[in-house]
Amino acid sequence: RNALSLSVETLAMSVLATAMAGVAVLLTFLPAARNLGNGELGGAPSRLWTVLYYLVRATFTLTRAIPELVWALIIIFFLSPGILPGALALGLHNYGVLGKLSAEVVENLDPRPTRALRAAGSSNFQMLFYGIIPQALPQFLTYMLYRWEVVIRTTVVVGFVSAGGLGREFRLSLSFFHYSEVALIIFWYLILVVGVDLLSAWLRRLARFD
């Protein structure tokens, strides 16, 4: 197959994996912050929040403890080879990593803004959207972009188990001793990595300015 189309496929896999992990973390990382359940940020302590804390934290630990390659080997039994199994494998592992990092961002927040909101009579919803998310979102975006840089490098690993992209073609070329194709794939892979690194750095600067 054309190296350019494989590069686009690899890039799509990395973007899909990062997006899936990011969306899943946005929906679940708040219960994984201990200070939200014990009232340190101004809210009332909640037993339900404590139970959610342990459940979500356990999920983060499980998903990041299993390497991307193992996730890919499991998923490939249920799905046809292609970028979707690779994206799911990468997304699951990075969900655990990004989730832990994001929860720790909330745990390290300055509690004074949320306490001031609570003292002014704000609801939990208002505390969340005016006190917690504005503080945590820039750091979350920074971590997500960093993980994208890691994901684009790991696509070649999951590709070895027929998860699509440059990784799969790299394995096939090595198996048939097509070293000229191997060199071409490495060249395109380096272009992808450098391009994603540069784009990620630019987007991180935008996130910090905001």
Locations of the language-model features?
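Generic hydrophobic transmembrane alpha-helix motif, especially the helices
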Residues: A44-G91
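Alpha-helical membrane-protein architecture signal
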Residues: L4, V8, L48-L55, T59, ...
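Glycine-rich helix-loop "coupling/hinge" segments at transmembrane-helix boundaries
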Residues: F77, V151-Y189, R208-D210
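Transmembrane alpha-helix boundary and packing residues in multipass membrane permease domains
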Residues: L26, L30, A72-F77, G86, ...
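C-terminal transmembrane helix and the adjacent membrane-cytosol boundary/short C-terminal tail
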Residues: T142, A183-D210
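Short amphipathic alpha-helical coupling elements at transmembrane boundaries
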Residues: S5, E9, Y53-R64, E104-A119, ...
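Membrane-cytosol interface at the C-terminal ends of specific transmembrane alpha-helices
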Residues: I74-F77, P81-I132, P138-R147, L198-A201
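Transmembrane alpha-helix signature in integral membrane proteins
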Residues: N2-R34, N38
